[in-house]
């Protein structure tokens, strides 16, 4: 709507010797503002830090795992010839994620020597992770992977001649070392990874040989998933039909990369308390692929050749990655880390009495070669020996936990229920059903065959929502100790926090003897 206001301004001019008055009318038009009007956002519930409703005590506990060992084939799992689902030797590689699911005891069922510090009727106890150390055994080493049939056509780095046309099969046996990665990621929920997979095409008439559309997928990182080795985070088994473009340990696997952006933006901050990361890579060699290009090089990008250069070669170039030197000076492991402030709203609180520790360490990826003798002869023959490849890993997890308490007000319980309703169920809080007003039936002879069976079905156990995922289970429910000074990480924590351990031995009271006085002899 346009409002028009007419304003009459009487302007009088008196002309000398003339009885005339001039009146001028001025019209002004008012229009509303055409700028976009932004309304205030709808108020939403605010996510607060755990420090606002969790009170920390001065009680600390140490917990540590046993020596954790893994042995297997670094390239593939060995399955039973009679049963394809039965794994005889698992795949254990230095390029795999190790996702430890650390189980903690319920502090509300913990036997404390003094329980006067909290009220079990109005408060609940939780654990807070304040320190950890991830120990790594075994020497530093570089693991090598490859493919006996790698799709490598020609060397494009220092070629002194134009290559001939590829034949029907130009695959070669080639090995390489991978990108170097060290990673330590801590949270009370499993880490989230990302990878590129096959998407859905909008055009239903697309041919099967066309380049498939790509889609970024998110998934839980499980124990045994492959890391990014330098060839990208993607589903190689789906996107590479020839199974020859990458080494054999990833040609039928999915390489995942932690989705740091998504975990950092998580509202409650449960998946990522903090992380340590170190990556490095350089390119060692340059090759190109054999095969028919699905997307030819445009004609305006080159001038056609003649003779042996009449047919353009493959432009599908690829490098072989390398992680370079490994050294003890750049190690992230075998040293303590203290959590003072998490990057998210969860400041180290272990909801569900569990902790997820995700580890990647490619600096100890040595593959050991084992050999057995088939036939004993005086001269060396290759057929007289069998070669095997194994990879071993060694871990040690140590933690320092702080006991915390939560006062259960109506507001806090509502907030926790909105965050995760399973927490209140684990604390045995739930809705009490109203008493039934209907008449119940009760039989006299409950074992009689003349009536229906009176056995009540047993209650179903609570199903673990993470049961379908694979993690390395570490049970610390019976490995908590309040004597921090008896363990290496506990002593480091006491030293850096300024706390003192309780004395174990009572010192005896010092005894003092009165000085003896000599009597002087008096001469008579």
Curated annotation (Swiss-Prot):
It is found in: Virion; Host nucleus. Keywords: Capsid protein, Disulfide bond, Host nucleus, Host-virus interaction, Late protein, T=7 icosahedral capsid protein, Viral attachment to host cell, Viral penetration into host cytoplasm, Virion, Virus endocytosis by host, Virus entry into host cell. Its main location: virion. It comes from the Viruses. Pfam families: Late_protein_L1 (PF00500). One of its GO terms (molecular function) is structural molecule activity. GO terms for cellular component: host cell nucleus; T=7 icosahedral viral capsid. GO terms for biological process: endocytosis involved in viral entry into host cell; virion attachment to host cell. Residues 501-524 are annotated as: Disordered. Self-assembles into homopentamers. The capsid has an icosahedral symmetry and consists of 72 capsomers, with each capsomer being a pentamer of L1. Interacts with the minor capsid protein L2; this interaction is necessary for viral genome encapsidation. Interacts with protein E2; this interaction enhances E2-dependent replication and transcription activation. Belongs to the papillomaviridae L1 protein family. Forms an icosahedral capsid with a T=7 symmetry and a 50 nm diameter. The capsid is composed of 72 pentamers linked to each other by disulfide bonds and associated with L2 proteins. Binds to heparan sulfate proteoglycans on cell surface of basal layer keratinocytes to provide initial virion attachment. This binding mediates a conformational change in the virus capsid that facilitates efficient infection. The virion enters the host cell via endocytosis. During virus trafficking, L1 protein dissociates from the viral DNA and the genomic DNA is released to the host nucleus. This is Major capsid protein L1. It comes from Human papillomavirus 58. The lineage of its organism: Viruses, Monodnaviria, Shotokuvirae, Cossaviricota, Papovaviricetes.
């Amino acid at each position: 709507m346009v409002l028009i206001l007419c304003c009459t301004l009487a302007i009088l001019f008196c002309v000398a010797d003339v009885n005339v008055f001039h009146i001028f009318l001025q019209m002004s038009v008012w229009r509303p503002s055409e700028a976009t009007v932004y309304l205030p956002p709808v108020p939403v519930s605010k996510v607060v830090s755990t420090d606002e409703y969790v009170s920390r005590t001065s009680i600390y506990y140490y917990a540590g795992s046993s020596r954790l060992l893994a042995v297997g084939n670094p390239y593939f799992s060995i399955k039973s010839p009679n049963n394809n689902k039965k794994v005889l030797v698992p795949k254990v590689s230095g390029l795999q994620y190790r996702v430890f699911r650390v189980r903690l005891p319920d502090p509300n069922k913990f036997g404390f020597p003094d329980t006067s510090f909290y009220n079990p009727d109005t408060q609940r106890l939780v654990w807070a992770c304040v320190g950890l150390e991830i120990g790594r055994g075994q020497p530093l080493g570089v693991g090598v992977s490859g493919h006996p049939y790698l799709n490598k056509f020609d060397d494009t780095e220092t070629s002194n001649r134009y290559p001939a046309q590829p034949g029907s099969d130009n695959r070669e046996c080639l090995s390489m070392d991978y990108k170097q990665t060290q990673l330590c990621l801590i949270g009370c929920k499993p880490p989230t990874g990302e990878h590129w997979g096959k998407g859905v095409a909008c055009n239903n008439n697309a041919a099967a040989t066309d380049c498939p559309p790509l889609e970024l997928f998110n998934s839980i990182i499980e124990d045994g998933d492959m890391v990014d080795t330098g060839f990208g985070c993607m589903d190689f088994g789906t996107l590479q039909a020839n199974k020859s473009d990458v080494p054999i340990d990833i040609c039928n696997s999915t390489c995942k990369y932690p989705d740091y952006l998504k975990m950092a933006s998580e509202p409650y901050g449960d998946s990522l308390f903090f992380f340590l990361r170190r990556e490095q890579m350089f390119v060692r060699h340059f090759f190109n692929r054999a095969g028919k290009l699905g997307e030819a090089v445009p004609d305006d990008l080159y001038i056609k050749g003649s003779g042996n250069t009449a047919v353009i070669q493959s432009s599908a170039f690829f490098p072989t990655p390398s992680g370079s030197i490994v050294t003890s000076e750049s190690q992230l492991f075998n040293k303590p880390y203290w959590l003072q402030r998490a990057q998210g709203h969860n400041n180290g609180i272990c909801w569900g009495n569990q902790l997820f520790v995700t580890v990647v360490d490619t600096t100890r990826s040595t593959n050991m070669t084992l050999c057995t003798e088939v036939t004993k002869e005086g001269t060396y023959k290759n057929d007289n020996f069998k070669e095997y490849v194994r990879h071993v890993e060694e871990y040690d997890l140590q933690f320092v936990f702080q006991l915390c308490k939560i006062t259960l007000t109506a507001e806090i319980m509502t907030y926790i229920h909105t965050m995760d309703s399973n927490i209140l169920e684990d604390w045995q809080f739930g809705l009490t059903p109203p008493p039934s007003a209907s008449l119940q039936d009760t039989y006299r002879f409950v074992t009689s065959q003349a009536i229906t069976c009176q056995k009540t079905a047993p209650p179903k156990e609570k199903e673990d929502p993470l049961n379908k995922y694979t993690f390395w289970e570490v049970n610390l429910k019976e490995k908590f100790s309040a004597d921090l000074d008896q363990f290496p990480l506990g002593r480091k924590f006491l030293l850096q926090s300024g706390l003192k351990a309780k004395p174990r031995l009572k010192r005896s009271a010092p005894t003092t003897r009165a000085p003896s006085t000599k009597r002087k002899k008096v001469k008579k």
